[in-house]
Every structure is written in structure tokens, then in C-alpha cells.
Amino acid sequence: MRCPFCRHDDTQVVDSRVSEDGAAIRRRRRCSACDKRFTTYERVELNLPAVVKKDGSRTEFDCRKIVASMQLALRKRPVAADAIDAAVARIEYQLLATGEREVRSEKLGELVMNELRGLDTIAYVRFASVYRRFEDVSEFADVIEEFRRASPAKTPRKR
């Protein structure tokens, strides 16, 4: 690795350690020319696919946008931030597992909806109403009916 001080190509690793979070390797290096020391970090590079929008334009995948849209759908709902982070991690994993270089925004929206379905039904309906551009109350009723068919009838709890 090239020395950042003198630009010499010959450096030696003096010490290597795994970072506290386990996501990187920290290496202390020494330049054989100027004898200065510096630190480098080695991390896994994840190549998430580019997002192809409805108009055909392409943009980098940004997990912050997914988190923000999920937080908006989950606003004032009893869902922990850790659950949102875990859902986003599952979405990223699914995207990486495809091996594709691009993902259509529609597919990404479906992945978000599937995660919200498991987290909170109200948030799912909120997100679906915006994502699918509901224009009529009957569309809300259709989604609610979907849930009723998918989940078995619950017996009311005694108070």
C-alpha cells in the first residue's frame, strides 16, 4: 500500500485487529522509506443494485430512503427502531442475493410492503395506499379484506 506521507509503495503491516463491531479489520502500517505509521481499514464492499425508476432513470440504492419511508408509514405505531433496521437489512440481503445489477423501483416497493406486512398492518396499509396510489376508499377495503382472508379469524379477548 502506498504511504500517504511520502507516496512510497513499500509499506509493512505492523499490527492487525478486528474492529469493535467486527465489520472491519484495522491495520497499523509503517512506511519503509519515511518510517511514518498510519492506519488503514479493510471492509467488505457490498454492491447493491442500482434502482431503475418508473421513468427509466437510474439512481444508487440508498437504504436511508427505505428507512425514511418505513418510518413514515410506522409513525406513531408501536414498532422499535431495531425492527425497522432489521427489516431494511433483510431487504438489502434479498437484493444482494439476486446478484442483479439493477432492481426496478416497483420490486423494491414490493419488498418494503412485504416487510411492513410482518411488522404492522396499519403501516402496511398506509404504505400501500401511497405506493399503489389509492384513489378510492374501496381500494383500502380491498387491502383490508386481503388481510382478513390471509389471517385466521381471531376470537375476541375477555377483559
Swiss-Prot record:
* Key words of the record: ATP-binding, DNA-binding, Metal-binding, Nucleotide-binding, Repressor, Transcription, Transcription regulation, Zinc, Zinc-finger
Q: How is the cofactor bound?
A: Binds 1 zinc ion.
Zinc fingers (unnamed), renumbered ranges: 3-34
Per UniProt, residues of the ATP-cone domain are 49-139
The protein's matches in Pfam families, at most eight in alphabetical order, are given as:
ATP-cone, Zn_ribbon_NrdR
Provide the GO MF annotations for this entry.
ATP binding; DNA binding; zinc ion binding
GO BP annotations of the record are: negative regulation of DNA-templated transcription
PANTHER family noted in UniProt? TRANSCRIPTIONAL REPRESSOR NRDR
Function, as annotated, reads: Negatively regulates transcription of bacterial ribonucleotide reductase nrd genes and operons by binding to NrdR-boxes.
Protein name in UniProt: Transcriptional repressor NrdR
Q: Which organism is it from?
A: Burkholderia orbicola (strain AU 1054)
